[in-house]
Design a protein with these regions (language model features):
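A conserved active-site cap/scaffold subdomain adjacent to cofactor or substrate pockets
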Residues: 154, 158-179
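Active-site cores that bind ATP or allylic diphosphates and position pyrophosphate for catalysis
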Residues: 2-138, 143-152, 158
Length: 179
């Protein structure tokens, strides 16, 4: 499937009130169809979630214990097959993160709550690679005055910026400790 076709499919799912996910419509292509498509472009690699769940005997509902929020669960059917390596042969960030965490012997991942949904895909990757996952803690996001997510891309969210604005280090630590 082309990126345009996939985006159209996701948009249709959103309009229907469904969670956008890969439907698998290009999964069952014949070898001839695959060869034709490869002449036009490189395919992305996806994890076949249904096959992985079946192969590993995983439950239909994935659960992980978040160190802050407690048990969080998600039905595997809501996840759908997801890209692991993009068509340019670059791994997606959460696949690279799983490998990186393993190589660096990471035991705890502390990140924003906007990454909770990624965690389920990562847990499937840990299982597929037979790697023990680290513990996860998802913290509330720090928001800008306009309630948008604070972002390093927009500036003003680095310690250096706070220091330039005159904030004392103790005040920043105190603020973060009280979140």
């Amino acid at each position: 499937c082309t990126p345009k076709e996939l985006e159209k499919e996701r948009e249709e799912m959103r309009k229907a009130g469904l969670l956008p996910r890969y439907s698998g419509r290009c999964k069952g292509l014949s070898e001839d169809e695959k060869k034709k498509m490869r002449k036009k472009r490189q395919p992305a690699w996806r994890l076949d979630v249904e096959k992985e769940v079946e192969k590993r005997g995983l439950p239909e509902v994935l659960v992980f214990n978040d160190l802050i929020r407690g048990g969080i669960k998600k039905d595997v059917k809501e996840i759908g097959d997801f890209v692991v390596v993009k068509s340019d042969q670059m791994p997606v960030f959460f696949f690279a993160g799983v490998v990186d965490d393993y190589l660096m012997k990471i035991t705890h991942v502390i990140r924003g709550e906007d990454h909770i949904t990624n965690t389920f895909s990562q847990l499937l990757l840990y299982k597929a690679l037979s790697i023990k996952p680290p513990q996860f803690a998802h913290i509330p996001l720090i928001l800008e005055k306009d309630r948008s997510k604070m972002s390093k891309r927009r500036g003003g969210s680095q310690v250096f910026d706070l220091r330039q604005k005159g904030y004392l280090p103790q005040a920043v630590v105190n603020f973060l400790a009280r979140l």
